[in-house]
Amino acid sequence: GRCCEGPNGCSSRWCKDHARCC
């Protein structure tokens, strides 16, 4: 799966810190 899957998607703090995963 992709790092940014889930209810918050790429708007979550973790995904902002790891944007290349999106």
From Swiss-Prot:
Q: What is known of its domains?
A: The cysteine framework is III (CC-C-C-CC).
Q: What is the official name of this protein in its record?
A: Mu-conotoxin CIIIA
> Which body tissues produce this protein?
Expressed by the venom duct.
Q: So what family is this one in?
A: Belongs to the conotoxin M superfamily.
Originating organism: Conus catus
Task: Tell me the classification of the organism that encodes this protein.
Answer: Eukaryota, Metazoa, Spiralia, Lophotrochozoa, Mollusca
Which GO CC annotations does the UniProt entry carry? extracellular region
Q: Does the keyword section mention Disulfide bond?
A: yes
Q: Where in the cell is it found?
A: Secreted
